A protein has these predicted regions:
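Active-site rim/loop-helix segments in enzyme catalytic domains that contact anionic ligands
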Residues: 1-101, 230, 240-242
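Metal-dependent de-N-acetylase/amidase catalytic core
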Residues: 2-12, 88-244
Length: 244
């Protein structure tokens, strides 16, 4: 099992589409990597139903964004954009990734959002995290049996829809890296020279709104920029001094 141990990550972030993770929690990812944590990203789909760009372009953009953030690994599960479901087949694909990388923390899509894939992806990953710890569920990769593994916690980042966070992470020193990673997806966002249709995320003020939300969350906790998360169960601290 040494091979699996070598692949162990501290944090594994899932997104229904390439760019979900960057938009929702890339500041936090950059911060954790700077602290020595190993982080990976798993995209569920290629975003093939997106109005702008192509699958090939988005693949290149996802690779560029991963390099900017410095993540250890990025994979895509090739689920059907818009039509993946929360069933055994899809759960097993997630379980294989969880057991392969054995993360302590999983980050995933918002619990509900404008895009239906976000809520679906959120529940799919959350359910798979629980099931991954059950010894009677057997999986293997490349002919090698996998051990059960259940992440300690699952946190949901916030996307289009405004959701009250349960906690926030100070990303003041990493807002520039976050925006650089987001802007790696140039096919998806505002370009005055583009002849492609204008979409909600390709509107002129969208990138400004991403930075504004981070600034507003930061304002509420006395820092310059922050990202918010929701939790599935109570968060434990060792002492009141851990809270700010």
């Amino acid at each position: 099992m040494a091979k699996l141990k070598d692949m162990k990550l501290d944090i594994l972030a899932f997104g229904a589409h390439p760019d979900d993770v960057e938009l929702g929690c890339s500041g936090t990812i950059a911060k954790e990597i700077s602290l020595g944590k190993k982080v990976g990203i798993i995209d569920l789909t290629r975003g093939e139903l997106g109005t702008r760009g192509t699958v090939e372009i988005r693949n290149t953009e996802a690779t560029k964004a991963a390099e900017i953030l410095g993540v250890s690994v990025r994979e895509n599960l090739d689920m059907r954009d818009g039509f993946f479901v929360n069933d055994e087949t899809h759960q097993l694909e997630i379980i294989k990734m969880i057991r392969k990388y054995q993360p302590e923390i999983v980050l995933c899509n918002a619990i509900q959002d404008r895009h239906i894939d976000h809520g679906k992806g959120s529940k799919l990953v959350s359910d798979a995290c629980f099931l991954s710890g059950l010894i009677q569920i057997k999986t293997e990769i490349n002919g090698e049996a996998q051990r059960p593994w259940r992440p300690k916690v699952v946190y949901h980042y916030i996307q289009w829809q405004t959701i009250e966070p349960d906690f926030v992470v100070d990303i003041s020193q990493f807002i520039d890296m976050k925006m650089k990673a987001v802007q790696a997806y140039s096919s998806q966002f505002y370009d005055p020279k583009s002849n492609e249709p204008v979409t909600p995320i390709a509107s002129k003020n969208f990138l400004e709104s991403i930075q504004y939300r981070a600034k507003d969350l930061g304002r509420l906790v006395g820092v310059e920029y922050a990202e918010g998360f929701t939790v599935e169960r109570y968060v434990t601290v060792n002492s009141l001094g851990d809270l700010k």
